[in-house]
Amino acid sequence: MRMSVAAIVLSVIVGAGCSGPSSDVFGVDLYSSSCVHCHGGDLAGGIGPALGPGSGAATLTDQQIVDVIRIGPGAMTSFRDRFTQAQLDSLVEFLRAEQGS
């Protein structure tokens, strides 16, 4: 009986760890902390170009967006060493959701 209670408790703990926030929520957090200052809270642009629906960014492939973030063309800061691939994927997923694609 003791073993089955321990197994149930362990499975609940492990299961809870698997149900973290969606990558879209993670993407919005990354955008808010690293991108909003230049690209705006509504992705309409500002210091940096617009990223929302109908923008040039909306025509880029996912890989092109990742490359832009990593390289930081023009006046944009390079985020090459700041984001993991999983974080980049989450950020692209967030942008695509906001762009309606």
Predicted regions and their residues:
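Bacterial signal peptide processing site
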Residues: 17-21
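Positively charged n-region of N-terminal signal peptides that target proteins for export
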Residues: 1-5
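C-terminal capping alpha-helices of c-type cytochrome domains
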Residues: 69, 81-101
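Surface-exposed loop and edge beta-strand positions of immunoglobulin-like domains
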Residues: 41, 79-80
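Bacterial N-terminal signal peptides
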Residues: 6-16
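Gly/Gly-Pro-rich "capping" loops immediately C-terminal to redox-active cysteine motifs
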Residues: 24-28, 32, 37-71
